[in-house]
Amino acid sequence: MTPPPSALPPAARRALFIYNLFFPPVFLALLPGFLLRMLRRGGYREKFRQRLGRYTAAECARFAQGEWIWLHSISVGETLLALKIACEIRRLAPEKSIALSVTTSTGFAVAQPHAGDWLEVICNPLDAPWIVHRALDAVRPQRLIFIEAIWPNLLAAAKRRGLPATFLPRLSPRSEARFRRFRFFTAPIFRLLDALAAAEPEDTARWQSLGVEPARLRVTGNAKFDATASDGARTAEFRALLQSLGIPDDAPVLLGGSTFPGEECILAETFLTLRGKFPALFLIIAPRHVERAAAILSELSPLNLRIVRRSELTGSGSQLPDLLLLDTTGELRDWYALATVVFIGKSLTATGGQNPVEPVLAGRPVVFGPHMENFAAITARWLAADAAVQVRDAAELRTQLATLLADPARRATLAQRARAIAAEHTGATTRTAETLLFSR
């Protein structure tokens, strides 16, 4: 049964007027860069018509049957979290089906293998009023759930139709500053939400200061930090691939996870230095954006490293390499289990940091640079408990890695302490899914 239409509050209408006034010129200004990224990443033709709110007759027929929840994500990180939430929603409400929408081709590539009877993967529509209305007409969701980012027109269109809408955000210092700067716009949009799932108790005051009503805030814990078993079969497969390259099981492995420009060169140079003391050391680099693989190979060329790309790795054997470049998506979590020490990307040459909890949940010690703003709460607790290592620069990175590679007991202690702190978020996935699914 379709809910009755609802009028938007005047403040929300004013905010949307401003948004739609500036959206076209901003979109056109950003379009060349967006198209360039799409071309580099590939896969942009996949269901491109859905970005304009157009669906095939077969897709519309499928959405016309069953009870659909629209789960809205952006790229790889958000999509992995969305898949986790989707599975929990399905467990809580097995009669529901999920339409998982993504923006990037890499996010689509991660989500698509999970599509099935109850999960349909689609592309996010452009956030223009007529396009999102067309998309809602096709998908016919009973509820809209946003993961880490809100499409204002999509949210408004859902609320006009009387649909509940909930939000699982990430409140980094950068995003908080942006929300505060444009509070005149963001606060009325936030007030359209039926519920917001906050990761930490201290986040509630921050969200209230940004305009979210206290009654709509729920503290659920961080679902990203809630342990999910890695795929043991995939890890075994990856171990066999390393063995086929001549890498013995007891060889120390340094893994750089979700690295950003500049960090690959630092890791490679560090690796060459450490090899003098640890001759069996092997390096794995997983760039955050796999389309940078060719640029990384070019940058590392002067170092004369023997590099093999994951996309070209068949298990048939080749000359013993120095470095494995993970230029595939959706595999990193299962590679972490093979590492001896993990460096967290986007923390040395960029700001914000990438998710440090996945390697910790795999039982691996983590090292990161000075910039972990997006994960400030948990990394601060780790550092206070001597459960992780933070370095200031490349020189200190070399020193700390040398210490850890030489000290198995220290590595085990770090991993155990960090995992114990992360375990405090056990159950966060269920609490988050319940909030996002049932709040009205």
Residue ranges and their predicted role:
Residues L154, E263, E331, Q354-N355, ...:
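Conserved sugar-transfer catalytic core signal across GT-A, GT-B, and GT-C glycosyltransferases
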